[in-house]
A protein has these predicted regions:
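Membrane-interface helix-loop-helix junctions at transmembrane boundaries of multi-pass membrane enzymes
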Residues: 91-95, 296-336, 370-378, 436-455, ...
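Membrane-embedded, hydrophobic transmembrane alpha-helices
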Residues: 1-93
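Extracytoplasmic
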Residues: 496-656
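Hydrophobic/aromatic-rich transmembrane helices and adjacent perimembrane loops
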Residues: 195, 276, 357-363, 470-495
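Active-site lumenal/periplasmic loops and adjacent helix-entry segments of GT-C-fold
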Residues: 93-95, 105-282, 532
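Hydrophobic alpha-helical membrane-interfacial segments at the cytosolic entry of transmembrane helices
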Residues: 95-105, 218-220, 372-394, 437, ...
């Protein structure tokens, strides 16, 4: 199957590129997967785009895939020929078993919430209730590439314009479906391998920083299990009233803050935002490269008597080293590697832009405490140049709201004040951020610098907005906590292993329980919730007709479609479910007003003018439909345009 060949060659290329990484076989596999996806995805996209838009060729993805496979094979062959040293596994059975079990679990969860099944002779794609809403734009984008040639790329829920959403991960999934993988395998495989690869590298970062493999395992465990007091509340209530059946069968996400009922802070985020795991995989490679540069802080010799005197001496030494020394502002001999890191982060911008922002913030924190700050500047400048190029290529500033940085204090706190933010963080994460402050005070200097760096995305989330919906800033806080977990894991291991005694072991158990119990309960909630799923008939007459008759240049007026047989055809909707396009920066209000007019007006001339002016080529009408609670009718539409498809209550009219 072409898709399997594509994946194998992609991995082989990435794996060979990682030869110089200071990790064992598992680390190389993980990094190789990420680099392979990044390179192969861009080659296919660029060649396919050029083939269709510039050369006007049909079947552009054929040329894109041939070019991608050929280039990746060439890179792999040249690297193998250049360096024939034998590969060392350098791993343990326990470590290998841990990674294998981890992969099986992640892959199972991906399929649990999104899979194809057969019911009553129909092939249905099932999406769990916790993810189907976010999957509406994801699957529509995937299908716009697998069933159509979405070049220049448009946003399917707001067609006829540009694309303001980082779509490249969906493009990769769409390309794999085009090459023969069923959509659930295409999306789930790259999602599972990307997230698994990130967690493998997170394990190695934690192991490298702390010196404990156990800290790596705990860090990965904490990734799945967030901190909050909410589950303790549920446990206390169950103990009080004895309703344990309700406790174990709960299907609603719990918490005390706005939108926690969305599953905004738990593993569900990675089940519905599949590209986030991939973005973090590339970010982890960048962080692994730079994090060693903070170790010098632990070698400072501080003189003086008394705590204050020693603190003053240490601050003066650090300040002189990071500001006044010659090495602080020079470029290192490994600046070329820093440039490659910049290329990777820049290439990531339209795979996951939020991860790029968070990573640059973290690297800025590293740079503050490091020598050779120009290396960081090289990485940042290349990243920003590539991001600027892509943003101007994909996004039309005249359409909707362009990306902008605005000051917005408080995030989702009830009171937009500093006390309100502190209260919000305690309600959201329990003891977590109190623990971060304590760890920053008591841990060694290099750890203090790392914590300072990893906390910067949290500060960004509470002060800056780049989109119309401030809630999307939750990703910055999630990213920060994922890396901050390393230091909690270190503290837990030290309490358990290095300080002998039952008391410290009890403290370790209590600490990890408080930090993970709500996240563990969230996993149960996901399991319970996604027993219920939204099913879409993949072979419906409507999907088939739309797939075969609608082109990517057509613009189709529908109801407020989220995930449906219409969106699974991969067509460009005039105004799909408005939240998706609105949160990406599109003017959904104007289009909604136009749609209400077209479906509800009795004025033929008004409808004709609107349809022509907006470039709408097809109108889909379903008996009994409403638009923003306004009644709709096709009484006038059928007088103006020919009905080209009818199936039950659904009719499609062609306007040109």
């Amino acid at each position: 199957m072409p898709a399997i060949a594509f994946l194998v060659v992609s991995f082989l290329c990435g794996f060979e590129i990682t030869k110089r990484m200071k990790v064992n076989i598992w680390g190389r596999i993980a990094a190789g997967i990420g680099i392979g996806y990044l390179i192969s995805g861009w080659i296919v996209y660029i060649v396919s785009y050029f083939s269709k838009v510039v050369l006007g060729l049909t079947h552009p993805k054929v040329y894109g895939n041939i070019a991608s496979i050929a280039i990746m094979l060439l890179i792999a062959f040249l690297l193998i020929a250049k360096d024939k040293t034998k590969m060392s596994l350098n791993t343990t059975k326990k470590e290998s078993a841990f990674f294998i079990v981890l992969f099986v679990f992640i892959l199972w969860t991906m399929f649990y919430v999104f899979h194809v099944t057969t019911e009553n002779g129909k092939e249905l794609i099932k999406s769990g209730v916790t993810i189907f809403s976010d999957f509406a734009p994801h699957t529509a984008m995937i299908r716009s590439f697998s069933l159509h040639d979405n070049f220049p790329t448009q946003y399917p829920h707001y067609g006829g314009a540009d694309v303001k959403y980082h779509f490249m991960f969906q493009f990769l999934a769409g390309n794999l479906e085009y090459l023969g993988l069923r959509i659930d395998w295409a999306f789930n495989w790259i999602s599972a391998t990307s997230l698994w690869s990130f967690l493998v590298l997170l394990y190695f970062i934690a192991k490298k920083v702390t010196g404990y493999a156990a800290a790596g395992v705990i860090t990965v465990f904490m990734f799945f299990c967030r901190s909050s007091f909410a589950a303790l509340d549920k446990i206390v209530n169950a103990l009080a009233d004895g309703r344990w059946s309700d406790f174990f069968n709960n299907s609603q996400f719990i918490g005390y803050t706005n939108h926690e009922d969305w599953g905004l802070w738990n593993y569900n985020v990675f089940l519905n935002q599949r590209h986030l795991g991939f973005g973090l995989l590339i970010a982890a490679i960048a962080i692994m490269y730079f994090i060693d540069r903070l170790e010098w802080l632990d070698d400072i010799e501080v003189n003086g008597e008394g705590r204050f005197s020693r603190l003053k001496s240490g601050c003066m030494i650090v300040g002189k080293h990071i500001v006044a020394s010659k090495d602080a502002w020079t470029i290192s001999t490994s600046w070329k590697t820093a440039a490659v890191v910049g290329l990777m982060l820049g290439a990531l911008s339209f795979w996951n832009g939020a991860v790029v922002v968070a990573t640059l913030l973290i690297l800025f924190g590293f740079a503050v405490w490091s020598n050779h700050k120009l290396d960081y500047a090289v990485t940042a400048v290349i990243t920003l140049i590539l991001t600027f190029i892509q943003t101007n290529f994909f996004m039309d500033k005249s359409v909707g709201q362009s990306i902008g940085v605005t000051y917005q204090f408080g995030f989702l706190a009830d009171e937009l004040t500093m006390p309100g933010v502190i209260t919000y963080l305690i309600k959201l994460a329990g003891i977590y951020f109190i623990g971060v402050v304590v760890l920053m005070l008591v841990l060694r200097p290099s750890f203090k610098a790392m914590i300072f760096s990893f906390i910067l995305p949290v500060i960004f989330a509470f002060t800056v907005s780049m989109t119309p919906d401030i809630a999307v800033n939750h990703k910055y806080i999630i990213i920060a906590t994922i890396f901050l977990n390393i230091f909690f894991a270190y503290a837990i291991v030290r309490l358990w292993k290095d300080w002998h005694g039952i008391l410290t072991k009890c403290i370790a158990v209590i600490l990890i329980s408080l930090l993970t119990v709500t996240g563990a309960y969230d996993l149960l909630t996901i399991y319970n919730s996604d027993k219920n799923a939204v099913g879409i008939d993949l072979d419906s007459k409507l999907t088939g007709w739309l797939k075969d008759n609608i082109k990517e240049t057509d613009l189709v007026l529908t109801g407020e479609d989220s995930m449906s047989e219409t969106t699974f055809a991969g067509i460009m909707l005039y105004n799909g479910w408005p939240y998706y396009a609105w949160s990406a920066g599109y003017d959904t209000e104007t289009r909604a007003h136009n749609a209400i007019t077209i479906y509800g007006s009795d004025n033929k001339e008004e409808i004709e003018n609107l349809v022509k002016c907006e470039g709408i080529t097809y109108i889909v009408y379903t008996d009994g439909m409403t638009y923003e609670d306004n009644p709709c009718s096709d009484k006038v539409i059928k007088q103006l345009y020919d009905c080209v498809f009818e199936d039950g209550s659904v009719r499609i009219y062609k306007t040109v």
